[in-house]
Amino acid sequence: MLMPKRVKYRKTQRGRMKGNAGRGTDVSFGSFGLKAIEPAWITSRQIEAARVAMNRYMKRDGKIWIRIFPDKPVSKKAAETRMGSGKGAPEFWVAVVKPGRIMFEADGVSKEIATEAFRLAAKKLPIKTRFIVRPDYEG
């Protein structure tokens, strides 16, 4: 699972996901990308499941880039705990994804293979996504 090696603060406030992504909206490493259309928290397990799905379909061909990183801890109180007595312990890590963000990129495979790999990866994610091709791609 992806998670930071160390953080300044163990627990964070939940915050809100307003507006569109300001950066990370262009395909910059590969030729194909998977773009988020809805805002969401993507957990490290979901990122890993999507990565495994893409790798299994693409086999040894091509390269995959993960453009999001789960750097936000989400805390949770134990089951059947009374209110109060502080905030719960960090339970899992999430990446805050806003609309327009490129989450995954791929290169070194045909457009058909990349489309199918991203389709399988999108099934593992809790949001609507769109397949993006780099503007200067010729294939």
UniProtKB/Swiss-Prot annotation:
Record has Lipid metabolism as a keyword: no
Keywords, ordered alphabetically: Ribonucleoprotein, Ribosomal protein, RNA-binding, rRNA-binding, tRNA-binding
InterPro entries: Ribosomal_uL16, Ribosomal_uL16_bact-type, Ribosomal_uL16_CS, Ribosomal_uL16_dom, Ribosomal_uL16_sf
GO cellular component assignments: cytosolic large ribosomal subunit
A matching Pfam family: Ribosomal_L16
PROSITE patterns cross-referenced by the UniProt entry: RIBOSOMAL_L16_1, RIBOSOMAL_L16_2
Keyword Phosphoprotein carried by entry: no
GO molecular function terms noted in the UniProt entry: rRNA binding; structural constituent of ribosome; tRNA binding
GO BP annotation list: translation
Family designation: Belongs to the universal ribosomal protein uL16 family.
PANTHER family noted in UniProt: 50S/60S RIBOSOMAL PROTEIN L16, LARGE RIBOSOMAL SUBUNIT PROTEIN UL16M
The protein's assembly and partners: Part of the 50S ribosomal subunit.
Job of this protein: Binds 23S rRNA and is also seen to make contacts with the A and possibly P site tRNAs.
Name of the protein in its database record: Large ribosomal subunit protein uL16
